[in-house]
Curated annotation (Swiss-Prot):
It comes from Drosophila melanogaster. The modification Phosphothreonine is found at residue 1148. Changing residue 1574 to D: Little effect on Scm-binding activity. This is Polyhomeotic-proximal chromatin protein. GO terms for molecular function: chromatin binding; DNA binding; DNA topoisomerase binding; histone binding; protein-folding chaperone binding; sequence-specific DNA binding; zinc ion binding. The modification Phosphoserine is found at residue 1145. Residues 260-271 have a biased composition (Gly residues). Residues 1-85, 107-174, 252-290, 1112-1244, 1260-1294 are annotated as: Disordered. The gene is ph-p. Keywords: Developmental protein, DNA-binding, Metal-binding, Nucleus, Phosphoprotein, Zinc, Zinc-finger. Its main location: nucleus.
Length: 1589
């Protein structure tokens, strides 16, 4: 049967079987709808995606043709259980098609279903209603255009993305199944070639949806490389192109059939798309003829020809995408990019002549239509985006890159936009665009047919630009058109040249045809990193060379030009065509790569897309399978951030369809491109190679099917793949861990706020050994399901039956049945895997998976006592848990290092388990992913499920923090949880031990770990991690397991309703979460901009006995985001344990318990406000920190409550809390004294997780560890830790992510494309490099950098790295301020003018005025004076609260807050509860806050009282004094070494300093002068000195 028939039949079968979604024509919609109905807005869980789940199984079955039979059993079973009946009719067709050698390319359409028609219908039906929720529509097609109900439902929460993993399903579940089977076949060149004979336009439902929902006005024509074209390029490209072509064929056919039949209805359903639908129908009708017809003819035939078109050119670059076949990736409407940039296509036809800003000129030298095209698009952008990039190469088409970045001269862009706007106003683009749409669609059909060949060829374009750029002939490629462009003979010559390069093109005569050359790098969202992965981003099944959404990743967040990509082809008249790239400049990098790898890249991009789309699962699995996994892991560290960003972009591309999704991915995307070209090239090339060779599918955000080796365990793959697919689909909306072609794993949070978590097992599997990965993926998928099932069973057993019902009656049944039998098998397996004891959870997952396998294999065993599974889990758990956690870590982003650490830890615990660990880790990751899915899907019931899961994990007896982190990430924020895997990685970095080995049984008894739910509140992911004593982990593993489960459930519940299933077990998580948070923050930091879902920093210390965790952070997250409200309720009940256990879990757990129990109990209630309750407890501080950092959610995972936290915390901390909230964490204040220190450490840990992650990922973990140890011991340590966290937090919101991204930040000029690789040209992430000077940065960056430096720097050892400007207190790196007292001449002048009393205070870091502003400086000055007067306590609090808010608002705050805090703490040590961390920071207000933390309190006290005369100073006093002096921090060690005490200091002369200490003369003079001034006025000077501190 031809694919069209198959798809049509599948559609019908799916439609018939899909009763839930009458609107949706395809089963995928039905499944999505049913999943939506079942799962509500969050289809992350299997229960929500019940049908999809079966479909996923089918996918897996299809992928594993050998496994299809067993698959069919499972399908049957799943159809029975999951109600997945959609697949059967299609499956028969699939098998037949497979046997017939028909390859289904739908897998390649990972995000976008291969059936453009179906997708369009679905998208239309879903999109038309959901058009208002633009985000939904893109998501819909990503997810295969689930039914509109689901789309709309999902739109708010990570829209249909969850389905995305089952994107094939979304397109058509049946299609998806075909795809799974087809993927392998599609990779076979022979099959694909045969299949590609008809190459209709391939329009992914996503694209269609984008068109309909977003009304994309740009026609994103992605023409697959024609098979014949591909023949020259390479077999793999052939595969990709064939697949793409086949997909196009199928899609076109489906579209034709659907458009003609049900398609019209679906098209009509997409309200705005209705004209497009008619056009599409016309195109489809004319699709066959279009190739032969000139655009004018087509237009005439279609009847949509505009006057300009009739006159002349088929230069339709951007059409309103309403009718265009390729729905825009982006959600309807520009989710993120302001001004509807790109909503209307920018149709700049000719770039040959400079754009004149005044005229409505069409930029169309050759095309008269261009005016119309551009003219109607006044909304195109905000005048920044379009610019004419002059190219020196006359022959090469001039490409104009419209990027939101004003990389290209903004004026020109504005002019272009102006001209565009004028043209838009003058010309009614809607009619013309509709005509264009018809024409272009026809043309595109022709061109795609023609250009399928041409695209690959264009890559070979003599001009390097074109080489990689996908040459898409947007304009109808007809000699008539070029003839119309008479003067454009040059252009046609160029076109001809390009086409000559494209000579392979079937229609050489069409050389006259204009080709829009879209460099994939330019087109794809991700440029550098995503040159290949542009396909991945597009991979949602978008085979289009032009990626549908052009996402401008601005600081604002993803800005999809996406609805419209502007492709300007050189005009036949010879004018160079403009390439308006709504895609972020990152695309340019791709262009370079493409040029470099012209032939391959041209093919590769197509393949990248095709395979990225189709290979997403393969990529994961194959990467896992291939030895690349190790390299991938290695690459992960280097490329992880870029790929995370890439994947985030991809997720964004997929999630951009969701309204919220774009934000996170955008940053990630550009970050990805931000990676240097070389990095991208290396990665992309490696990815391309891997894809070309391995045909690794780029990780689709939701892997519809993990394509494990076909030969691999079919049952597991089927079950696991299915589960993975379902889970991934479910999770797709949530954190999506995308495995880059490089094998890097990315967890991308969908902006919708639902964390998109690709199952770690799958995604992370790539990192692990291929063989293990396959098995692990399978096992892990099964284990995930099994664990979920077992957890459900346990829950049922443990009175969690209700929870199971919540989760999914179907899942519960399936899992229960499977669990029984599988648990037995898994018991044996677990016993067998005793080496893999870490697989306890993993095996639980395996049990689930294998049970699923066994369901087909032996359902009889399902009835075995659940007790066996539980017992087995418990038995195996202790060892396996750690291993799985390690595995998870390994699979996590930067997990190699973490893996080594965790593996070492786990090996130390269970060396024999090391081998099992890799698999188990992956499995655990999968479990975690499943947990997240469950969490997301079953937020209400998730707690029970998670609890059971966690119980199982904890039963494993090993730290399964990863599950918690994931639960946290699931807790609510796409951005908030940048990546569950990132969190896991961070957690693993913090230590496998942190994972509180929570035995499944011990409920919340152990206070060892508190879990901070990571939520993106505001822009920054506020992932406060919990701190748990690793010792306590071991001690109370069972309790922690329970707690952890509860915590996860609570976190998830917190996301929904923080209701810990085990009320006591809210605090299962330990430092690993912290690490995770830091990782996530780093990852999410940029992404988090849009979603400030401060996940409640559930810095709930687990009280040892009650195990009551205050989901403080959850409650606080309430302020930040969805989680917040629920958490509060839970925390109050847990109040006693509310305090986070300081991360130094071993010590602090007890103190933390004490601390927690007292304030915490109240805290929980306040949690909702923020972690204020926490603040009342020492704990609050994590929230409080977040909140005070409200500007930077990082601190405040509680940020949502960061402000709230400030207010709430302040009461507990009295005066300090305000200042703390402003800067530090009130929670410390709440704790007060040692306890507060402990909680401080906790806070610090959390903060570190965020802030450190920003400054340094390792630091965050180490800080947490340090805090853990020190928090118990010293308040100062805690304080410093806290400070670190605080600084890191403020950075975390902005810089943290950038820190992750920063290596990638580049600006490239490639082929006239200016590629800016970051939202900011060079983000503040630079603070990462201590030697760089903040002053080098622009004010914003400077402020953020200073925040980072001050907070993180001070916290860590600001003294060592940072020096405070004496005047404004701005923290500068020593390298810069090394010999200077002031950061700027202005400060020096101010200091001279105000030297009298405030000078010293200003000199200290207290005044952040430099950045903050005069007011803030005045506040600082007043604070300094107050400090000097010892009025600090009374005055400091209000002032701090005042100044911090100001400072908090600005990045400068951290410096301010530190000084203020220091001042506060100085006046009264009691203030420490306020900011015990602050107190530490204050002492070290100078950069050496950490170093001086011990002495600082004294010094501040001394300051408060008059500091003793200099002559009585000790060496430490002198060192602190010197440390305070700007530019002298570097010499503190010299003073200490020289043993210069107060008396010696008085005797010092400049020559002594210069000669003996090797100081520069300037600092020596300053020191001497300072000493002289202090000698003259001892108290003021001393006050000044203390102020400095």
């Amino acid at each position: 049967m031809d694919r069209r028939a198959l798809k049509f039949m599948q559609k019908r079968a799916d439609t018939e079987s899909d009763t839930t979604t009458p609107v949706s024509t395809t089963a995928s919609q039905g499944i999505s709808a049913s999943a939506i109905l079942a799962g509500g807005t969050l289809p992350l869980k299997d229960n929500s995606n019940i049908r999809e789940k079966p479909l996923h199984h089918n996918y897996n079955h299809n992928n594993n043709n050998s496994s299809q039979h067993s698959h069919s059993h499972q399908q049957q079973q799943q159809q029975q259980v999951g109600g997945k009946q959609l697949e059967r009719p299609l499956k028969c067709l699939e098998t037949l098609a497979q046997k017939a050698g028909i390859t289904f390319d739908e897998k390649y359409d990972v995000a976008s279903p291969p059936h453009p028609g179906i997708a369009q219908q679905q998208a239309t039906s879903g999109t038309g209603p959901a058009t208002g929720s633009g985000s939904v529509t893109p998501t819909s097609h990503r997810h295969g255009t689930p039914p509109t109900g689901r789309r709309q439902t999902h739109t708010p929460s990570t829209p249909n993305r969850p389905s995305a993993p089952s994107t094939p399903n979304t397109n058509c579940n049946s299609i998806a199944r075909h795809t799974s089977l087809t993927l392998e076949k599609a990779q076979n060149p022979g099959q694909q070639v045969a299949a590609t004979t008809t190459v209709p336009l391939q329009i992914s439902p996503e694209q269609l949806q984008q068109f309909y929902a977003s009304n994309p006005y740009a026609i994103q024509v992605k023409q697959e490389f024609p098979t014949h074209t591909t023949s020259g390029s390479g077999t793999e490209l052939k595969h990709a192109t064939n697949i793409m072509e086949v997909q196009q064929q199928l899609q076109l056919q489906q579209q034709l059939s659907e458009a003609n039949g049900g398609g019209a209805a679906s098209a009509g359903a997409g309200g705005a798309a209705s004209p497009a639908n008619s056009q599409q129908s016309q195109q489809q009708q004319h699709s066959t003829a279009i190739s032969t017809m000139s655009p004018m003819q087509l237009a005439a035939a279609t009847g949509g020809v505009g006057g300009d078109w009739t006159q002349g050119r088929t230069v339709q670059l951007m059409q309103p995408s309403t009718s265009f076949l390729y729905p825009q990736m982006i959600v309807s409407g520009n989710l993120l990019h302001p001004g509807g940039l790109g909503q209307q296509p920018i149709q700049v036809i000719t770039a040959g002549k400079p754009f004149q800003g005044n005229g409505p000129q069409m930029l169309t030298t050759t095309t008269q239509n261009a005016k119309q095209m551009i003219g109607g698009q006044a909304g195109f952008a905000g005048g920044n985006y379009a610019t004419c990039i002059p190219t020196n190469h006359n022959q090469s088409p001039q490409t104009v890159l419209f990027s939101p970045m004003n990389v290209i001269s903004p004026q020109q862009q504005q002019n272009l936009l102006q001209s565009m706007a004028a043209a838009a106003q003058q010309q009614q683009l809607t009619q013309q665009q509709q005509q264009f749409n018809q024409q272009q669609q026809q043309q595109l059909t022709q061109q795609q047919q023609q250009l399928t060949a041409a695209l690959a060829k264009v890559g070979v374009d003599a001009q390097g630009k074109l080489a990689q750029k996908v040459v898409q002939k947007v304009t109808t490629t007809s000699s008539a058109v070029q003839a119309a462009t008479g003067p454009g003979s040059t252009g046609s010559t160029q076109t001809q040249q390009v086409q000559q390069v494209q000579q392979q093109q079937q229609q050489t005569t069409q050389t006259t045809q204009q080709c829009v050359q879209v460099s994939q790098s330019t087109l794809p969202v991700g440029v550098g990193g995503q040159s290949v992965q542009t396909a991945q981003l597009l991979n949602a099944g978008q085979a289009q060379q032009m990626q549908i959404p052009w996402f401008l990743q601005n600081a604002a967040g993803l800005q999809p030009f996406g609805p419209n990509q502007i492709i300007l082809r050189n005009q036949p008249d010879g004018t160079q065509g403009m390439f308006i790239q709504q895609q972020p400049a990152t695309q340019t990098l791709q262009t370079q790569q493409n040029q470099i790898i012209q032939c391959n890249v041209t093919q590769t991009p197509t393949k990248a897309r095709t395979q990225l789309d189709a290979l997403a699962p393969k990529q994961q699995q194959q990467q896992q399978q291939v030895g690349t996994t190790n390299q991938t892991q290695q690459q992960q560290l280097a490329v992880a951030t870029a790929q995370l960003q890439q994947q985030q972009q991809q997720l964004t591309a997929a999630a951009l369809q969701r309204p919220g999704a774009p934000v996170m991915p955008h940053n990630g995307t550009q970050v990805r491109p931000a990676s240097s070209v070389s990095t991208q090239t290396a990665q992309n090339q490696s990815l391309l190679k891997a894809k070309m060779r391995n045909k690794q599918q780029p990780v689709r955000p939701a892997l519809a099917t993990l394509k494990t080796e076909i030969g691999q365990v079919a049952g597991q793959n089927k079950v696991v793949g299915h589960l993975t697919t379902v889970q991934q689909q479910q999770q797709a909306t949530n954190l999506q861990q995308v495995v880059n072609a490089a094998g890097n794993k990315m967890v991308v949070m969908s902006t919708t706020g639902t964390p998109i978590t690709l199952q770690n097992g799958q995604t992370l599997h790539a990192a692990t050994a291929a063989g293990v990965d396959k098995q692990q993926q399978q096992l892990q998928l099964f284990q995930k399901q099994q664990i979920l099932q077992q957890q459900q069973m346990l829950q049922q057993q443990i009175a969690a039956i209700q929870m199971q019902q919540q989760q999914a009656a179907v899942q519960a049944q399936q899992q229960q049945q499977q669990q029984v039998s599988q648990q037995q098998q898994v018991n044996a397996q677990q016993q067998q895997a005793v080496a893999q004891q870490q697989q306890a959870v993993a095996q639980a997952q395996q049990q689930q998976r294998e049970q699923q396998q066994q369901v087909a294999q032996a359902q009889a065993q399902h009835q075995q006592a659940l007790a066996n599974a539980t017992q087995q889990i418990l038995q195996v758990a202790p060892n396996q848990f750690i291993t799985s956690h390690q595995q998870q870590q390994q699979q996590q982003l930067h997990n190699q290092l973490i893996q080594q650490q965790l593996q070492q830890q786990a090996q130390a615990q269970v060396q024999a388990q090391v081998q099992a660990q890799a698999q188990q880790q992956q499995q655990q990751r999968e479990q975690q992913q499943n947990i997240i899915q469950q969490i997301v899907v079953q937020q209400s019931g998730a707690t029970s499920q998670q609890t059971s899961q966690q119980q199982q994990h904890h039963q494993s007896g090993q730290l399964q923090l990863s599950s918690v982190p994931f639960s946290v990430s699931s807790s609510t924020t796409p951005a908030g949880i940048a990546t569950s895997s990132a969190l896991q990685a961070a957690l693993s970095a913090s230590g496998a031990i942190f994972q509180t080995a929570k035995p499944g049984t011990c409920s919340s008894s152990s206070p060892t770990s508190s879990v901070v739910t990571i939520t993106n509140q505001s822009s920054t992911p506020l992932v406060t991690s919990s701190t748990v004593a690793s010792i306590q982990q071991a001690q109370t593993q069972s309790a922690q397991v329970h707690q952890h489960q509860q915590l996860i459930s609570a976190t998830i519940a917190g996301g929904t309703q923080q209701q810990p299933q085990g009320p006591p077990s809210l605090t299962p998580t330990t430092n690993p979460i912290l690490a995770m948070t830091s990782m996530m923050n780093a990852t999410v930091g940029h992404l988090s901009t849009a979603p400030p879902v401060t996940v409640s920093v559930t810095s709930t210390a687990v009280t040892s006995s009650p195990g009551q965790l205050v989901l403080l952070s959850t409650a606080s997250s309430g302020g930040g985001g969805s989680i917040p409200a629920t958490p509060t309720k839970e925390t109050p009940s847990k109040g006693p344990t509310a305090t986070l256990v300081p991360i130094g879990s071993p010590k602090t757990p007890v103190s933390g318990k004490d601390t927690c129990t007292t304030p915490k109990s109240s805290t929980p209630a306040t949690v909702s406000a923020s972690v204020e309750a926490s603040s009342s407890t020492g704990e609050a501080l994590s929230n409080g920190d977040a909140s005070d950092r409200s500007s930077t959610p990082s601190k405040g995972a509680t940020t949502p409550t960061s402000k709230q936290s400030n207010a709430a915390v302040q009461p507990p901390s009295s005066t300090t809390p305000n200042s703390v909230s402003g800067k530090e964490e009130p929670k410390l204040a709440t704790c007060g004294s040692l306890t507060s220190a402990t909680s401080t450490s906790t806070t610090t840990t959390i903060t570190n997780g965020i802030g450190v992650a920003r400054t340094t990922a390792s630091t965050a973990v180490s800080t947490a560890s340090t805090t853990t140890t020190s928090s118990g011991t010293f308040i100062t340590s805690c304080t410093s830790t806290t400070t670190t966290t605080t600084s890191s937090i403020s950075n975390g919101s902005k810089d943290l992510p950038k820190a992750m991204i920063k290596p990638n930040v580049l600006t490239h000029v490639i082929d006239g494309f200016i590629i800016q690789e970051a939202n900011e040209p060079f983000p503040v992430t630079r603070q990462r490099y201590a030697d760089k000077d903040v002053s080098d940065e622009p004010p914003k960056k400077k402020a953020t950098m200073q925040e980072d430096i001050k907070l993180s720097g001070i916290a860590s050892a600001p003294g060592s790295d940072m020096v405070a400007c004496e005047q404004c207190g701005k923290m500068e790196h020593k390298a810069k301020l090394k010999r200077k007292r002031y950061c700027s001449p202005g400060c020096s002048r101010q200091a001279k003018n105000g030297i009298g009393g405030v000078g010293s205070g200003e000199t200290n870091g207290l005044g952040t005025g430099g950045i903050v502003g005069v007011d803030a400086m005045a506040l600082v000055d007043r604070l300094d004076e107050a400090m000097a007067e010892e009025k600090m306590q009374t005055e400091a609090t209000p002032k701090l609260s005042e100044s911090f808010p100001i400072l908090g608002a600005s990045t400068e705050v951290p410096p301010m807050s530190l000084p203020v805090q220091a001042a506060i703490s100085a006046p009264s040590p009691l203030a420490m509860p306020l900011g015990s961390p602050l107190s530490v920071a204050l002492p070290t207000l100078a950069p050496l806050s950490v170093v001086t933390s011990g002495a600082a309190p004294k010094s501040s006290e001394v300051n408060g009282t008059d500091r003793p005369p200099i002559s009585s100073w000790s060496v430490d006093d002198v060192s602190n004094f010197i440390r305070e002096l700007p530019g002298c921090q570097d010499y503190v060690d010299d003073f200490i070494q020289q043993e210069i005490d107060g008396q010696a200091l008085l005797l010092l002369k400049e020559k002594h300093l210069v000669n003996a200490m090797g100081m520069k003369l300037g600092p020596a003079l300053k020191i001497v002068a300072k000493v002289e001034s202090i000698k003259e006025v001892p108290p003021p000077g001393e006050a000044k000195d203390p102020g400095a501190q």
